[in-house]
Regions:
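Transmembrane beta-barrel wall of Gram-negative outer-membrane proteins
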Residues: 1-86, 112-114, 187-188, 199, ...
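Structural signature of outer-membrane beta-barrel domains
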Residues: 11-16, 22, 58, 72, ...
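Solvent-exposed loop segments that connect transmembrane elements
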Residues: 16-51, 87-104, 145-182, 224-268, ...
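Transmembrane beta-barrel outer-membrane domains
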Residues: 52-58, 107-113, 175, 183-189, ...
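A structural motif corresponding to the C-terminal end of an alpha-helix
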Residues: 61, 65-69, 337, 345-349
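Face-selective signature of the C-terminal outer-membrane beta-barrel domain
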Residues: 78-80, 113-140, 176-313, 335, ...
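Membrane-embedded beta-barrel scaffold of Gram-negative outer-membrane proteins
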Residues: 119-124, 128-146, 348, 354-366, ...
Length: 435
């Protein structure tokens, strides 16, 4: 028996955020900037003003092929293809107006992925056998208005202002905060899972499930920060021109080409994660009405971080940056391993009622901090850690599922408590740790 199913779809969504007229210039009151004696250039967004500018569209398809190979084995293959295109932003600034923003550079998103998966399941005597695997390929390209960086960026004057003279460290004029970020992410992920489980033909006094899970993920990301509002990017007067921003020799780079002079900073990073997990659970029938289930998952993962953060400068100070393989990150993999457990007791006093208690552990993998161990501008602050560990949860749950009033009322009730420790948080602090 063979069956094929296809679903094709497209959805166009109108916007609801207005990009309204506005102007922007650097604030002479900011401690990062030269002060009121310096000339500041203003930027306006007249070319980008638009009502309901955050429209989007989704389109794609899903194809499935299911086949019964014989009395014991079935095969399912599925392929998904989807593309998202979106403009604008989906939040707003209450200080500007209800559902209104002032954006000074284009905001666009193109997000496309394909995923192919296969599931083979069957029976071998007293065992039910399952294999499932998938491959994901995703490409995301995005433009982001980064003009808000002008409010806090300590290094912005260096990039967009002019020195008063060749020997003076003060600035005579500053360009505008027209900063555009170009994001390019490539993500590949491959997963495999193989499991066996006892079935009703087993004569063992308990039932069980056991298996192995393998996960390999690759993320290649490029973020290019374009300072389009620089006062004199080509040089002029006593101010030396920008130099072409080229990759660090010997450092890992997905894109080995030199960037334009307006691309004053970029990240070209490779992150990989490989995980192998073994899992199993056993269910013991204590009585006809009471079952105990005990499970565990032992995982081991290697996490890698490579690449570079590249800065472009002026004059003889041609280039600088961070080669993460040669720096504190090194070439060693970050290894994390542990075992998490689960216990469930279930009690069925009758055919219509189930009481249960569960205690389970969970985790989220750790990783590398790109700005790890960098010295903050404020000496009272600590440097970010080089790596961060997994955060962990312990979940406790008590619940009941029952039918009442001769089956006319269903009741599901649960009490739960989650203890979450070593919580992972992110911090964007360009004033103290510029990454």
């Amino acid at each position: 028996v063979w069956a094929v199913r296809g679903v094709f779809y497209r959805s166009d969504l109108g916007g609801y955020i207005d990009n309204v007229p506005g102007t922007l210039s650097l604030s002479p009151m900011s401690p990062s900037y030269p002060g009121p004696d310096t000339t500041y250039t203003e930027i306006d967004n007249a070319a980008l003003v638009e009502d309901d500018f955050n429209d989007s569209s989704y389109q794609g398809f899903r194809l499935s092929s299911a086949m019964t190979l014989n009395d014991n084995w079935d095969l399912l293959i599925t392929h998904i293809d989807q593309e998202i295109n979106a403009d604008g932003v989906f939040d707003y600034d209450p200080a500007v107006g209800d559902l209104e923003v002032k954006r000074f550079a284009p905001d666009t998103l193109e997000d496309a992925f394909t995923q192919t998966s296969m599931t083979l399941e069957g029976r071998m005597g007293t065992l039910d056998v399952l294999y499932t695997g998938s491959y994901l390929d995703r490409q995301v390209n995005q433009l982001v208005d980064y003009s808000g960086y002008g409010n806090v960026g300590n290094w912005l004057p260096y990039y967009i202002c002019n020195y008063a003279s060749a020997t003076s460290p003060s600035y005579s004029a500053c360009g505008n905060a027209d900063v555009l970020v170009v994001l390019d992410d490539q993500n590949e992920r491959t997963t495999h899972e193989f499991r066996i489980a006892s079935n009703e033909m087993s004569e063992l006094p308990f039932s069980y499930t056991a298996g192995v899970f393998i996960d390999e993920s690759i993320l290649k990301t490029i973020n290019e920060y374009n300072y389009n509002g620089a006062a004199s990017p080509e040089g002029g007067d006593s101010y030396a021109p920008y130099q072409v921003n080229c990759p660090i020799p010997g450092a890992w780079a997905r894109d080995p080409s030199c960037r334009p002079i307006t691309t004053r900073f970029y990240n070209d990073i490779l992150r990989t994660e490989e995980q192998t997990s073994f899992f199993g659970e056993v269910t013991f029938p204590v009585t006809d009405k009471l079952d105990f289930m005990v499970g565990m998952r032992k995982y081991d993962m290697d996490i890698d971080f490579r690449g570079q953060s590249k800065f472009g400068f002026r004059g003889s100070n041609v280039s600088n940056g961070r080669d993460y393989d040669a720096g504190v990150h090194g070439t060693d993999l970050l290894n994390q391993s542990d075992t998490v457990t689960k216990f469930t007791a279930s009690y069925k006093p009758d055919d219509d009622t189930l009481w249960y208690f569960t205690r389970s552990e969970g985790f989220r993998p750790g990783g590398w901090n790109r700005g790890g161990l960098l010295a903050p501008a404020n000496p009272d602050f600590q440097s970010p850690p080089l790596t961060y560990g997994s955060d962990d949860t312990i979940n406790t749950e008590i619940g009941v599922k029952t039918m009442l009033m001769d089956g006319s009322l269903r009741l599901n009730a649960t009490w739960y408590n989650v203890e979450w420790t070593d919580i992972q948080v992110s911090r964007f602090d360009p004033v103290n740790v510029s990454i």
